[in-house]
Amino acid sequence: MNKINKSIATALLFGLVSVACIAQDDDGPAGFSYVTYHYCDVATQGAMDAAIETNEKAVFDKWVADGKLIAWGYLSHNTGGRWRRAQYHVSPTMADALNNQAAIFAEIYADNDAGGQARSAACAAHDDYIWALNQGSGAGTDRGDVSLSVYYVCDINREDRADEIVAETSGPRLNQMQEDGMIASWGWQSHRIGGRYRRLQTITGADHASVVQARGELFQYMNENHSELAEEFTDICGSHTDYLWDIVHEAP
């Protein structure tokens, strides 16, 4: 089993994925995050927040404390696309991620039909993804209060090359930005199950302005120092959607 602590799991996911690669027990991903991205009516999304706080938070916290989950968290939309809320949990394998998704909600709502119905009414549609945690901030990293998440649409036949470019260019630069205090953490993750997005880059920091500034400085660095590789990356992953998330709950 890969060993992964809070700083790795959460930094990878919204922060989540160094050095340019996390130390692992083998060559596989450090973990797998099951993420549910919710479409909510802005008039009712507060009911989802209440359901998480009242019905789910204590159970998720206990699962983490008991070692059933590596980490979990809940995020609120600030800026970006149509997703309004995101909830995630991290497991050591993809099979565990799938099984834990079913088991924990069965535990929470088995005897609370009304709570489950209220939750569904608050956010009536969602997208599920499983992300493999591949590159990002290493052990001992505390992530920030907000996350800039960039969801990339990539050529499935060449996306592994995009991973190599990140490891060679932007990854080391993000490590330096973290050491310099410009960002709190960063991550790079790959699609395993879900919709059209194939890669996810995350940067966390103290506030929205700082993570946006950091991304702008990363663009400038790439254009000035790795312009050909930056063009190659854009050719592989030519479309993306940006989100700014506020981190509402997380454990450990």
Put a short name on every predicted segment:
Residues 22-111, 117-252:
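Short S/T/G/P-rich N-terminal loop/turn motif that feeds into the first structured element of a domain
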Residues 9-18:
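Bacterial N-terminal signal peptides
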Residues 1-9:
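Bacterial N-terminal signal peptides that target proteins for export
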Residues 2, 20-22:
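Glycine-centered signal
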